[in-house]
Amino acid sequence: MPLLDSFKVDHTKMNAPAVRIAKTMLTPKGDNITVFDLRFCIPNKEILSPKGIHTLEHLFAGFMRDHLNGDSIEIIDISPMGCRTGFYMSLIGTPNEQEVSEAWLASMQDVLGVQDQAAIPELNIYQCGSYTEHSLEDAHEIAKNVIARGIGVNKNEDLSLDNSLLK
């Protein structure tokens, strides 16, 4: 099985909250695809609650599009990490970490503006595979934490995992 890029970085050196350009690629037609690691929690020390990350998934995807999409940027997908320490965001375009950070902070403010669980998009049995597993309160706590701590930048060259540790 090939070793994925996300496992070639040293998770013990990651800061959070922080933005990292996880991968860039060029499509055959010349479009730039950028994958961002949006790290909410320090790996192996903090974790997002299942209900909080699920609610955030429903809110964050739309709010980030509101703040980041434009003429040269279109978000393809924002998905939670299985380790529950953040999200991956794939998009067409090449925004820098500062642009992504600003959109992320604005999105967290938007999350705090949602005051009723009924206002969570797609929160119903037809559009969500676990529609009862949500917590607006947990999502608010996550957003407050990001805002209070601020968003830094994780650089791949600072996180390079020594080859002797690759398995």
From Swiss-Prot:
GO biological process: quorum sensing
GO molecular function terms listed in the Swiss-Prot or TrEMBL record: iron ion binding; S-ribosylhomocysteine lyase activity
Catalysed reactions, as listed in the record: S-(5-deoxy-D-ribos-5-yl)-L-homocysteine = (S)-4,5-dihydroxypentane-2,3-dione + L-homocysteine
Co-factor(s): Fe cation
EC category: lyase
Cofactor mode of binding and number, as noted: Binds 1 Fe cation per subunit.
Keyword Secreted found: no
InterPro entries: LuxS_sf, Metalloenz_LuxS/M16, S-ribosylhomocysteinase
Binding residues for Fe cation: H54, H58, C128
EC number: 4.4.1.21
Keyword annotations: Autoinducer synthesis, Iron, Lyase, Metal-binding, Quorum sensing
Classification via SUPFAM superfamilies: LuxS/MPP-like metallohydrolase
Quaternary structure annotation from Swiss-Prot or TrEMBL: Homodimer.
Entry's family note: Belongs to the LuxS family.
Functional summary from the UniProt entry: Involved in the synthesis of autoinducer 2 (AI-2) which is secreted by bacteria and is used to communicate both the cell density and the metabolic potential of the environment. The regulation of gene expression in response to changes in cell density is called quorum sensing. Catalyzes the transformation of S-ribosylhomocysteine (RHC) to homocysteine (HC) and 4,5-dihydroxy-2,3-pentadione (DPD).
Descriptive protein name: S-ribosylhomocysteine lyase
